[in-house]
C-alpha cells in the first residue's frame, strides 16, 4: 500500500465517553491509499471550507458543523477525486445535535453526479468495518481512503449530547488537517462524518448521521431536494419543473 495522507482538520476537541480520552484537534490520516478510478463512493467526496464533505444531492453537501459558521458565508468548493472541479457554496445549516452540517450550493449551481450516496438510518454497531475518505487541505493530488472499524458509541455534551462513535483504522492510517467532515461508509451507506482525532494509534471520532436524518430531510426540503434513503436522491429543481410541465414526469 502506498503511503499517503488522508486528512482530518479540526476546529475543536471532542469530549468522549468514560472509556475514551478527550481528543484535541485532528492531525491527519497517513498510510492511506489513493482511490481507484472505479470507486463509486469516492466521486461524491468534495473539499469545502478547508474540510471534507460529501455531495448527497444535487444542491446539498453533508459536512462537519465545526468547519462552518451558521449562515450565508460563501465557500470555495473543489470536486473530483483529483480535485479538478471548482464551484461555490452559499449557506450552511447546523444540526441541532452532533457535529453535523448541511451546506447548500450557490444559486444556479448544482452537482451533476449520476447518483448520490444512500444515508444510513440506523446507528452503526461495534465491530462493523467501513471505508473512510478525507482530503488533506494542501498536499494530496488524489483522494485517499482507509478501512476503519467501529468501536464505541457515546453521546457528546459539546454538541448538545449528539450521538457519536469512535473507529480505529485497520491499515495504520491516522488523521491530518483537512479530513474533518470526511464520510465513513458502512455497507455502502454513509454512516458518519469525521469530527475529531488526536493522532497515530488513537481512535477517530465521528458524528452519527442516523440521529439527525429527520433534520437532514427537513433542511434539504428548503429547495425540494430529498436525500437518498434507499430510493435515490431527488433534485428539487427537476421536481418543480416536472410539476410545471417543463420536464416530462418520471
Place the predicted regions along the sequence by residue:
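Extracellular/periplasmic catalytic domains that process cell-envelope and extracellular macromolecules
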Residues: 37-41, 55, 93-97, 122-126, ...
Amino acid at each position: 500500500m502506498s503511503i499517503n495522507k488522508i486528512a482530518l482538520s479540526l476546529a475543536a476537541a471532542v469530549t468522549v465517553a468514560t472509556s475514551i480520552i478527550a481528543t484535541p484537534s485532528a492531525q491527519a490520516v497517513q498510510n492511506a491509499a489513493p482511490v481507484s478510478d472505479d470507486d463509486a463512493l469516492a466521486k461524491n467526496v468534495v473539499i469545502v471550507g478547508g474540510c471534507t464533505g460529501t455531495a448527497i444531492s444535487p444542491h446539498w453537501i453533508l459536512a462537519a458543523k465545526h468547519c462552518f459558521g451558521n449562515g450565508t458565508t460563501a465557500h470555495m468548493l473543489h470536486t473530483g477525486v483529483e480535485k479538478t472541479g471548482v464551484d461555490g457554496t452559499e449557506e450552511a445549516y447546523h444540526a441541532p445535535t452532533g457535529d453535523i452540517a448541511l451546506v447548500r450550493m450557490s444559486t444556479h449551481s448544482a452537482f451533476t453526479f449520476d447518483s448520490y450516496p444512500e444515508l444510513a438510518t440506523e446507528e452503526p454497531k461495534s465491530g462493523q468495518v467501513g471505508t473512510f475518505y478525507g482530503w488533506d487541505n494542501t498536499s494530496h493530488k488524489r483522494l485517499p481512503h482507509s478501512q476503519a472499524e467501529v468501536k464505541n458509541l457515546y453521546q457528546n455534551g459539546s454538541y448538545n449530547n449528539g450521538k457519536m462513535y469512535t473507529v480505529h483504522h485497520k491499515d495504520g492510517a491516522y488523521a491530518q488537517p483537512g479530513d474533518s467532515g470526511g464520510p465513513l461508509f458502512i455497507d455502502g451507506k454513509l454512516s458518519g462524518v469525521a469530527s475529531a482525532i488526536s493522532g497515530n494509534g488513537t481512535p477517530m471520532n465521528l458524528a452519527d448521521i442516523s440521529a439527525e436524518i429527520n433534520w437532514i430531510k427537513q433542511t434539504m426540503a428548503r429547495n425540494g431536494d430529498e436525500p437518498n434513503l434507499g430510493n435515490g436522491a431527488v433534485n428539487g429543481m427537476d421536481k418543480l419543473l416536472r410539476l410545471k410541465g417543463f420536464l416530462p414526469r418520471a
